[in-house]
Amino acid sequence: MVPKLIPVPLSSSSFIEFGSVLDRNLTKKISINQATTTRFHKMATVKAFPPDAEVILSIFSGINRGYPLEINMMERHPIGTQAFFPLSEEPWLVVVAPDSGDKPDEKRMQCFLAAGNQGVQY
């Protein structure tokens, strides 16, 4: 049975076991294009395995599934990092679990409440 998870606030220290927190408010901002655009500089470093593998960027748009949210699937991506960042300013949930061989360790699964300006990379 999967445990009932209580979200905790997302922070660099609370998420360190799983990856990095990306935060627009803590990232160097550079004004470009005659001050019409702000670049949030070097928020994440992309890693792929092997190192010469092609790296791509995709954008996914998910739907709000409501609460209580039942987690019935988790993914694992051992050959490269992924970053998740909201397209809106709305808070969102990040549910992660450490690897336990070939599947997630459900007993150590954690839920984080991310602010609309925060993303994660792992």
Write out the residue ranges for each language-model feature.
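Non-catalytic, conserved peripheral segments adjacent to functional cores
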Residues: 1-107
